[in-house]
Amino acid sequence: MDKNTTIGIIFIVLIFVGWSMFFQPNNNNTSTNSNTEQSLNHNQEKNNLESNTGTRIKHGSLISIENNLLKLDISDVGAKPYSVILKAQKRYDGTTLNLIDSRNSNNNFYFSLDVNGKKVATDTLDFELISKTDSAIVLRHQFNSNQHIDFTYSLSKESYKIDFAVTTYGLNNSSSQLPVKIYWTNNIRAQEENREYERSYTTTYYKPINADTDYLSETSDQVTKKLDKEDVKWVSFKQRFFSASIINENYSFKNIEIKQENIDSSDIIKHMTLSADLPGVNIPQQTYKFWFYFGINNYKILEHFNIGLEDQIPLGWGPLRWINKWAVISFFNLLDSYHLNYGIIIILLTVVVRLVLFPLTYSSYVSQVKMQVLKPEIDAIKAKFGDKDQQKLQQEYMKLYKSAGVNPFGGCIPLILQIPIVFALFRFLPSAIELRQKSFLWVDDLSTYDAVIKLPFNVPFVGEHISLMCLLMTISTLIYTWLNNRTSGVTGQMRILGYIMPLLFLGILNSFPAGLNLYYLFSNIITFAQQAFIRIFISQDDIHKKIQDHKKKPSKKGKSLFQKKLEELAKQRR
């Protein structure tokens, strides 16, 4: 690698390391004491409400509705979701994937409303089953002969969507007309083997009515967000591959407060809460319509609802998101339609990406060869002027570059132009649920690391395992560096730095998904092939002849903007 190419790679590495550090999960987790305290406070609130209504809490039975994708269990105490099982998915250990699991947990979902001047929490009420089919149920709590409240759940076929309605009858006689409040608390259960990596993708998303989708920080130990000036359409407790979302269909959520905190336990990674206001009951029969999304974070499925739920999938910002949305996902889905192995799909995706980037690779390689040809003359100029006159040194460099028709940063710029595509795939592949628990060769799960060696101790910057796919990627990068150094003649610190950078990638990517490392590995292999192909048609002798021919051409008057800028920088250094 020549100096300018190395500078370009260093620039990419610095961005990559900074990105990784910014999104690195914080290991200083909040202890379970905070969660316990919150649970006690919540129970105290329920007791206060219960004393107003005189309703006794008891352990009730579960009523189920299901389709081929999920099973929803609803408790007749509170008429609330007790369990949501995704039938087509499994946890990393092969056990049932419970997206909502209220066993041994303080999960809760309820409404607080005014009934005859008293504050009532619905999670303390006993509900009676009024009607039930395979896909819908109606539960009712009767306050008296003239007043009751119905909870209706209905589940469509082939869908993760659950329609939910709360209908009040005769509860509009309150003089205060207080807003109805909704509360939802959920302990987020770890579904993946790499808990810390999953935690870094777990957060709360929300969509204001008149603003873009937003979210809480994934890396903070504890976050509270109050939205007292914005009406919100939906709120979602989002994990890496799954989401539990509530969407307000006929009103909007007001005066929202959302909280989340890291939990240090063997099974729970975060605790999330939502509280919000709804309009008060002001007519004899008032219905609040919602729907839940309990399902996978699949871009196509979420986009179908046309309310921005797909924004939860972290595809990157600005141009990165556009590249992923319009190019990467479209081509990925096209290959997926042929029912290929996902490892093969990643390889084919890599081939297409490298072909698209081939003009930049070609330009970078040609520029590198040009700088190699000019190296003896560059060294001669440096030996003549050295550090005595930096301005004169830069002027002589510019004369040489101009006469030879060479851009000294020609090898660096193409590398920088590749950054959006490189980072687009860096965001897409770890978020692609299609890779979850899909095998390829020795890799059991392309969505997580392939730990071929598990260490009995923690190695700083590496972890407690060695990923074979990451190791192969690192070796291929070292080979690529060695081959380039042989032709570029780079020496000294630049040569050493070229070998250090792949080792940094080993530490950074060792805990990243095997699918991502598979992409980088084959990207290196294809680059080898491309450079071998380029060498067939380009030689240093040909480049040298073109440079000499360019020197013989009459020089154009005036200086280029690039040359003027370099000379200005040289003057500033004096």
Q: Which stretches of residues belong to each language-model region?
A:
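Outer-membrane beta-barrel proteins
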Residues: K3, T53, L62, T152-S154
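Soluble non-transmembrane domains of integral membrane proteins
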Residues: E66-D311
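Short extracytoplasmic/periplasmic juxtamembrane "stem" segments immediately C-terminal to an N-terminal membrane anchor
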Residues: N33-G54
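Helix-loop-helix
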Residues: M1-L40, I74, F164-Y169, Y183-E198, ...
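Intrinsic low-complexity, intrinsically disordered segments
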Residues: N47-D73
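A long-range scaffold signal marking pre-active-site subdomains of enzyme folds
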Residues: P25-N28, K46, I85
